Amino acid sequence: MNNSISISIIAPIYGVENYIEKFADSVLSQSYQNIEFIFVNDGTKDNSMSVLNGLIDSKFSHLKDKIKIINKQNGGLPAARRTGLDAATSDYVYHVDSDDWLAPDSIKKIVDEIERTSSDIVYFNLVK
């Protein structure tokens, strides 16, 4: 694996103040490097964005050039995903919910499968 495949991780943010720190830490700590991070603030009324921005400033400032934060009025999950998709510039996109978390090598495993199979779409089970 040579990090030649680019991935955009798209995460709508709405009402996840209690989950956003663990989620963002897991996403921004991926072992794979060629990632664009797109966080879509879907008009959340809680402190989700403050927590996210604080985490980026304190722990992930070295990734700021790879992070896009898009603010929009609340339109629901499909509209937020579409907004993120419109902003994505990578070869592949990965939609993830902001109350979930990723293992440190999740994206690497996805890219390994893309390279192994030359797939356009990769589908996999989630661990609960």
Where do the model's predicted regions map?
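Nucleotide-sugar donor-binding/catalytic module of glycosyltransferases
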Residues: 1-128
